[in-house]
């Protein structure tokens, strides 16, 4: 029951946090506000719940608010589902130390970006377009550097604080 409640809170954060950057979409695509609650859900609740929240969040947010726009929300759903699943799985396997948190986080971020690129390539291919490697690098890494740094700084602090406070799902 706790996992359901924590997952629902993370999903709600996915819906609300982008409003902080919503007036300037470029800032939202740089700070990646939906990624943090998904990764946190994976850390707290495990890979299955993290994947469910990650896949649902961008699609639900698109249905409710029109953002992120189609077809980007589809590739984002696969990306965030991968984040939640991988970080939850690795965190359970590697333990709760700072090193385990960072390894889980970095591996999840790399896997999620790879899945995002594959999904973008598939979507663009279905629409008769192409998705060159330069677009992948720009979308997955170059424009996302501030969000990547934010995640690498904020999430280990949050996870350690919640673990020390005894928050467990």
How does the language model describe each region?
Residues 44-48, 89-94, 161-165:
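Structural signal for the C-terminal ends of transmembrane alpha-helices
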Residues 1-11, 98, 131-169:
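Alpha-helical transmembrane segments and their cytosolic interface
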Residues 34, 39, 53-57, 71-76, ...:
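Alpha-helical transmembrane segments of multi-pass membrane proteins, especially transporters
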Residues 1-44, 48-49:
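Hydrophobic transmembrane alpha-helices
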Residues 16-31, 56-90, 124, 134-135:
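Interfacial aromatic-anchored transmembrane helix boundaries in multi-pass membrane proteins
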Residues 19, 63-66, 117-122, 148, ...:
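Membrane-embedded alpha-helical segments of multi-pass transporters/permeases
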Residues 1-4, 47-52, 70, 96-102, ...:
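Membrane-helix interface segments
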Residues 5-16, 53, 75-121, 159:
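Short helix-perturbing small/polar motifs within transmembrane alpha-helices
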